[in-house]
Structure formats: C-alpha cells, structure tokens
C-alpha cells in the first residue's frame, strides 16, 4: 500500500513555510505549542461569535504566529474580512483585548494583524469550510464537490482533488468518494500544493473532507 505523507510537511523549506515561528528550550517546547493551539482556537471562536452574517463561515486561510521575548505577533490571513464585526480597526482591538484577557500575557505584548487573501477559493481551508457548510445544509455531496471545483477553476489554479469520507448521504456503510480536475503532482516537491483535512459533524455522523490544490 502507498504511504501518504502530508503534502505541506513534505514541502517545508521549498514551497511551504512554517505557520509558527519561534525558538524555545526543549523542556518548554510543548508549552509553546499548546499556547499556539489555544491562541488559534480563541481567535476562531471569537470570529465565529462576532461575525456580521451568521453563516457558519469563518473564511480563515491560516493563522501565523511569531514569538519574541517581549512580543507575540499574530497574522490572520482571512478570505472575507467583511464577515468580521463592523469597524475593522475596532474589531481587531476587541479581538486583541479578548485574547489577551484569556491568556494573561504579563510580560509579553500581543499584536494582531489581519491580511486579506487575494483569491479566497485558492485556499484549501476556505474551500473545505465551504463544502462543510453545503453538506450541513443537506446539499448533495457531488453537487458540493462540483461547485467547489468550479469556484477554484475561477482562480487560475492548475488542478484540484477533493475527497469526502464517512457515512455519505446517511448510508449505513461508510465509503470514500473523490473527484479530481487538472493535475495534482503530489510527488513533485517543487509543485506548490495547498492541502487541508477538515472534520464535519452531521446528523449521520462524522465526515472527513480532504482537499489538495495545485497552485503553481
């Protein structure tokens, strides 16, 4: 059987960069890692609660974290900044205060910035979220997959593969369904590929969505 490596980890240092950038002593590494995860979850929860439109759609492509001795810098790459609460500057300030309260950063400053993603549907995370929303609204899985591919094709990507696994359409036996358009060269390290694994809870159980996008 073929062993499937994570396409992002496989390309670190060539076409991919780390989403967290900091140094720590080996004994403190796990604490720093858990802190990163908590910061990301806190930001996602805040955006979910304070969206203008209650669509269940976050539109976050990725959250990058850079740490120094006295500063934690968080950059949120978001596809649809308009979904955030009114007054972008006020929204960022509120988010910053909210995260700072939760973690009690005594000797470190927290700085949050928001960057708009040029082509949202070129991002695997945003696309997976879109498919998940369609499946929650009882849209046929094939229709959701085809619509996602149509949205990606508008962004000049070279190829896309979408896979859904689980009790699709409420069938008793779990199965895997996938669709591919264009080229997705997983073995070529030079190929810039965006990948995402996304879990969604439906009334029938848990479904897993995987997306591979050949960007360049």
From Swiss-Prot:
* Keyword rRNA-binding part of the UniProt annotation: yes
Coarsely, its chief localization is plastid
Specify whether Hydrolase is a keyword of the entry.
no
The KH type-2 domain sits at 43-118
Where does the UniProt annotation locate this protein? Plastid, Chloroplast
| PANTHER family given in the database record | 30S/40S RIBOSOMAL PROTEIN S3, SMALL RIBOSOMAL SUBUNIT PROTEIN US3C
Give the UniProt family note.
Answer: Belongs to the universal ribosomal protein uS3 family.
Q: By what name is this protein known?
A: Small ribosomal subunit protein uS3c
Q: Which organism is it from?
A: Dioscorea elephantipes
Q: What is the lineage of its organism?
A: Eukaryota, Viridiplantae, Streptophyta, Embryophyta, Tracheophyta
Gene of origin? rps3
